[in-house]
């Protein structure tokens, strides 16, 4: 585990882009492309336009390389049908894709965090949902963190995974 380095900031939105900061989508692509063994993702919402910014293609690419992907989705059954269908297809095609449903009995409780952790060494923490609006159109902010901080965020996702249900329909559910 390397020591913490300073956070890197990425943004979306017309009033924030173009001021020497990376775009969120560029930061996500760059970080995920460097994965060596595992990617953990916590998602509140995955938008219907996700394929427009290549999120599913990015997942397919890392899964084809044999990278383990854990995706914990808030209330999977409430996600758009087209998104659920694609995720179930990925789960059935790739044994290294673990799809989990965070669906607590208390309806006031949600997984609202937007997190991506790569190899327990890099963490992306931000406000953007996995949607066209979140990754491109809205004014959103994301930080890339490393070292102990990223490791601890990965541990939190490990704990959340244990307390989430495997989605029925894939080999892991």
What role is predicted for each listed range?
Residues 44:
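Glycine- and other small-residue-rich loops at beta-strand/loop junctions that grip anionic moieties
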Residues 1-29, 34, 38, 47-173:
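PLD/PLD-like phosphodiesterase catalytic module centered on the HKD motif
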